[in-house]
């Protein structure tokens, strides 16, 4: 990140320290004696904005660097050298509302860059930022960070920046060796619910689990069905929950007051909680193709199971399968990442393995 500052595409495994890499780089590159905003970090979700701001503050605690955040219900009263926000807020707060502040910007980080570029709304905001830099002849270093970059994403980046430094991994290097990947055959969607119910019957109160579901509708249905069975579960959604409720849910989950969290992909990327030892894919993630068909969402799969096995700890990812296309998609994921997803032997073995992981970490 020294002069001359090249733009960088950096790929690294989930849980390997990407935040530390760009966080330390950002903090060491800004002038702490200047009150101008010099670096902006773009995150996909509110939860990640809050999480990353906190981590950057820890890294900067022995400096005069001030980290600020912009949220839908929170704008800073004072400015700092580094701002964390979503791409949409970069456009609305930075490019439109406070355009005079952008002249001192020298670094822009896109965390989970592949999803920011793929998403129509966030990519539009980022493209407007790039256009502004070009129009104003600004020399802004762009850092693209993610565990996953497909060919189309890399092409989009190179269309804007012909000269970027690439740090890439082979696909087979991306699969997470600290995460035991399993699948469980269920005879129906109701059988998937029964599996989770059986797990909750015998799990201890200290074991936290994230359950990923593909649609908001089924997030709500799964919560309702499990609650009727007497299970205490909580949900996390994006725009369908108020910011205050989202913040409180994450706070309680981190503290261990909530053990079971059902969510959509809003929590699939970047969320960091070492105590999560089990991730369950109620649905395998899929992405709609141009012809209307569905293919496995390989990137989302890797990011979902990457919510466990963080920073050298051990974890388990269980994929629940019932329809024939579930097994086809599972095989495609195995082939794509050149990995093996084993059939789960028994609930008892799963619990024994989880218990061992918790013991090893304590």
Regions found by a protein language model. Give the residues of each.
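Conserved nucleic-acid-binding Ia/Ib motif block in the N-terminal RecA-like helicase ATPase lobe
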Residues: 34-96, 104-107, 224, 231-236
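Arginine-glycine-biased low-complexity disordered regions
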Residues: 5, 133-140, 201-207, 218-224, ...
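Walker B catalytic acidic pair
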Residues: 87, 111-113, 215, 282-283
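Conserved SF1/SF2 helicase motif Ia
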Residues: 7-16, 27-52, 63-67, 134-139, ...
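Conserved interdomain hinge at the start of the Helicase C-terminal
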Residues: 128-130, 178-228
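Conserved ATPase-coupling elements of RecA-like P-loop NTPase cores
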Residues: 22, 52-53, 92-98, 112-129, ...
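Post-DEXD/H (motif II) to motif III coupling segment of the RecA-like Helicase ATP-binding lobe
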Residues: 100-172, 333
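Conserved two-lobed SF2 helicase motor
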Residues: 79-94, 250-269
